[in-house]
Amino acid sequence: MRNIEMWVPDAGQADIAGLRGLDADALARYVADPAYPWWRRVPCARALAERVPERHVAHLISRVRDPGDVAEVRIALLDLLADRAELLPWLKHPDRRRERSYGMPEAFLKARGMLGDRSAARELATLAASPWARRQGVGEAGLDALVTRYGVEVVLADLGDERPEDRAFRVRMRHRAAADVTDALADPDREVAHLAQSLLSDPRRVRGYLDEAPTVEAKLWAAYALHRLTGDVAETRRVYDTLGRPRVEVAGLDDELRGAILHEYASGCERQSDPRWRVEALCSEPPVRPDQDEQVGRATAALTEAGLAPMPAVSCGEHHRQGDGTYHVMEFGENELFISTLGRFVTSAEPDLTARQALESAGFRWIDETTSAIRVPGLCVYYFGERAPVSVDTLLFYWQA
């Protein structure tokens, strides 16, 4: 197997073109042997595309069926053997739903789609609507296989249009057929409306829709799409003014906090977010961000003058030894001060009246427990696997690994 090792010298360094030049029998034997490193077996499976020796099929299928084998190898083999109808009864067996190896439930669904199993369509549509790119790609591949085999109308009929993910698939198919999907901006599900606006390409059609859109939210999606297509801020602001400048009102969130949060998160918020946040951000001026070195220096001086002996500040990423975010951490005694990079906002891990008074005298704004707990509705932000509204303290002092 020296030639295989030459073309795959280390994990992540596979030369698939080189592997394709090797004997198919040798590759099949290598893939089927769990004694070899999985990171070499996977590229060998990919190099077997469209040339699997028939005499090795049964052995390769046994590797797919073995839950003790490495998931990456089993997934690669499912892709390789996507035309083997004998796999379908096993794939549809209820036991497959109990497998939880990473990526396997999705791979089973994709394989069912590749093999023409229309009963997998609804679950594939759910996968295709996932915010995770890998899961989305798997779902789309399975649905595309069903469309290729049966035609788009059959698959659309299987799905219906009650669920948002089914309507999202319908929007994608209409767009693929070069049909106008502007009307989907009025879909009651924001993820579907967001998908529709991302597919629009004709500014004139979007302008025309502004007069016919049935809801303010649909008009906001149109304004957002129009700005994406033209970059014309003045036009976007005119539309926003015509609509009455609608925004999500949040009790306790004053203009200073709102501006800092809005211009940090609205442009990259999750697709289920309220479009009022997106358009408000386009139509308002961002606040001036503080000079971080000056801000840290001022906080250090204030705590030092108060006799609290602060340690040098570090970024939240350095403090956690991974990731990044929107604040610095400054230790003082047994406590920690958090200094936001979004404005003059500070808080501490434990309440400290001396630190608070010193910092407020130095021009900082202390974020107390009441303000920290304010939840910002409709602004969905990715935070440790969740995509949902979070509270002010998370937004001002955000860290992500």
Regions found by a protein language model. Give the residues of each.
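Structural detector for internal amphipathic alpha-helices that build alpha-solenoid repeat scaffolds
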Residues: 2-21, 39-53, 62, 71-84, ...
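Long, compositionally biased non-globular segments that serve regulatory/targeting/scaffolding roles
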Residues: 23, 246, 345-349
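Short inter-helical turns and helix N-cap capping residues of alpha-solenoid HEAT/ARM repeat scaffolds
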Residues: 35-37, 67-70, 98-101, 131-132, ...
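Acidic, proline/glycine-rich low-complexity IDRs
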Residues: 134, 365-401
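Eukaryotic acidic, Ser/Thr-rich intrinsically disordered low-complexity regions
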Residues: 224-262, 266
